[in-house]
Amino acid sequence: MKHVRIFATLLALLVISVTPAVIHSEDVYREVTASGAHNLTLAVDNPRNLGGADDAALARDVAEVLRFDMTLAGPFSVMAPPAGTSPGGIRPGEFDLDSWRNAGVDLLVKSGYTITGDSVTMEFRLYNATQGRELAAKRYTGKRSDLRRITHTFSDDIMQTMTGERGPFTGKIAFVSTESGNKEIYLMDYDGHNVQRLTKNRSINLNPDFSPNGRELAYTSYRRGNPDLFRREIFTGTEAVVSSHRGINVTGTWSPDGKQLALAMSRDGNSEIYAISRDGRDPRRLTTHQAIDVSPAWSPDGKRIAFVSDRLGKPQVFIMNADGSDVRRLTTSGAYNVSPRWSPKGDRLVYCRQEGGFQIYSIATDGTGDTRLTSEGSNEHPRWSPDGRFLTFSSTRDGGEAIYVMRSDGSGQTRVYRSKGKASHPTWSPRW
């Protein structure tokens, strides 16, 4: 019932009023950055009380969430209100926008809250201080406990306004943690808040992967003594076995249409890549080789699958058609390359290379542009955000193993969660 209530709460987030979207959002970006000399300076003003009780903690939390999201976003140099700017209200004409422009601000976020019992209404407004005009205005109503999600939603709206594509900030990250003494699967906001435990089977659970609609997770569990593949409905907790053949049933990943999963199975004595229906029927063997083949990853159009094979002596990343034909090697540098994952745009893959510890690399689908993204500690399990702008991964750089996020070019590496045990195998949900 807890998960049902969570789902109902998410559905209850109601957009009360929405101003028309900016049609030429890329033009807005060009207007503000016409000089090409700097990132956008984005100021987040402190939220104002628009009615009802004061709540300083609420105002602080909203500002912190917005600043964190926009700092990670990258095109923005994020700042608190600079000296000499007009506080005033939040709507056009209620404050001096020129004072913000004169303080070097390109973009300004104003917000306010109204508290009524357990309900809070948040109003957000985005201004182009350089051009002296409003770009977006949104109002949301929800429970006090919904506040972080409401704020992340407006961060997504800012990205939509400025780039033409929504941000990923309302997404969740599923991951594995040993905090309970076992490897269990957990779920959290992308920034490490609102952590909840999903599995409680006191066993080893690995490699969670979100379904395309974000409502299910596929994962491998040893709960019955064999590494079997399960799928779990996130909001109800309902589970079903997908593959329990003798031997391994691991690294399961969903096809883009959600009808199949690709996984590695050893049902025939050797680890090979298979495709199987979501209910476990009709397994189709895709690779036929005496080497070990594991870690399949679908291309976003569903036409190709990347995977790892040691058929040339050491693990390397290969690509094949979704029916198993036309196998070709992708990685040619490094002696040990694993854990590939296709970008949502389909133009690149990320993977891990062993260099003492593991480091994360990004490579184009034709094998060019092989670029190292990490350097500190050992870094594994890279997974893309749904918009392809960011990655989540695990790292040991601060001692232990924790969950991080970064931009897709390797910049902005930020720890978002560190548990009492080890945290690993993160995966970013589709947009909910």
Curated annotation (Swiss-Prot):
Keyword field: Cell cycle, Cell division, Periplasm, Signal
Keyword Cell division on entry: yes
GO cellular component: periplasmic space
Signal sequence segment: 1-21
Classification via InterPro entries: 6-blade_b-propeller_TolB-like (IPR011042), PD40 (IPR011659), Tol-Pal_TolB (IPR014167), TolB_N (IPR007195)
Superkingdom of origin: Bacteria
Record bears the keyword Cell cycle: yes
GO biological process, one term: protein import
Pfam families the UniProt entry points to: PD40, TolB_N
Compartment annotation: Periplasm
Disulfide links within the chain: none
Complex and partners: The Tol-Pal system is composed of five core proteins: the inner membrane proteins TolA, TolQ and TolR, the periplasmic protein TolB and the outer membrane protein Pal. They form a network linking the inner and outer membranes and the peptidoglycan layer.
Described function: Part of the Tol-Pal system, which plays a role in outer membrane invagination during cell division and is important for maintaining outer membrane integrity.
Family in the record: Belongs to the TolB family.
Protein name per Swiss-Prot or TrEMBL: Tol-Pal system protein TolB
Species the sequence originates in: Geobacter sulfurreducens (strain ATCC 51573 / DSM 12127 / PCA)
